[in-house]
Amino acid sequence: MYYLKNTNFWMFGLFFFFYFFIMGAYFPFFPIWLHDINHISKSDTGIIFAAISLFSLLFQPLFGLLSDKLGLRKYLLWIITGMLVMFAPFFIFIFGPLLQYNILVGSIVGGIYLGFCFNAGAPAVEAFIEKVSRRSNFEYGRARMFGCVGWALCASIVGIMFTINNQFVFWLGSGCAFILAVLLFFAKTDAPSSATVANAVGANHSAFSLKLAL
């Protein structure tokens, strides 16, 4: 039970919990939001999901490369967290109105945001925390379990909230994102001194090239 005294175990376990809590507010209810709230047809729904998949495919290799380059630095997670803070304003004031204005424009904008934050963002978050688990000596699977609990709990809560007012769901997601920011701020991922020296002299970095990116 040594991991219970590990601060990073709790920090990133809770990060998983709230990140997947937000995902649980998005994935199961997104088709319902499109059809019942925005009255999007099935064919247009297909366009939206195709755009999300397209941008996910574009972002995932980039995130993989950035994750390797950044190591234990939290820059990418800060960007993802910052975008998740805008979860409610994006859905309520940007994505929904854009879908009513022009389905293609709305699909592109939604594909970029959702592909970045979730479809490509989730693997980047998991890869980062896996690195932290090795650095901080806690089992990744135990921290990842927090995410499963967060998703399951959210599905129960959001299902009730959605029937009352669908906007509550998005504001709940933004509130959870603020908690992510607090957790990320206090989490310590400093590399050990030997690794820091190796990074400083470039021993742990390969030269960037187009071949590497592809």
Model-predicted regions and their roles:
Residues 1-7, 187-214:
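Juxtamembrane intracellular "pre-TM" segments in multi-pass secondary transporters
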Residues 2-53, 57, 210-214:
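Helix-loop boundary and gating motifs at the non-cytosolic
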Residues 17, 87, 99-124, 128:
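Hydrophobic core of transmembrane alpha-helices in multi-pass small-molecule transporters
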Residues 53-61, 151-152, 156:
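Residue-level signature of mid-helix packing/kink "hotspots" within the transmembrane helices
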Residues 58-72, 161-163:
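Helix-to-loop junctions at the C-terminal end of transmembrane segments
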Residues 68-82:
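Cytoplasmic membrane-interface "Motif A"-like loop-to-helix N-cap segments
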Residues 81-101:
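C-terminal ends and interior cores of transmembrane alpha-helices
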Residues 169-186:
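Symmetry-related core transmembrane helices of the 12-TM Major Facilitator Superfamily/SLC fold
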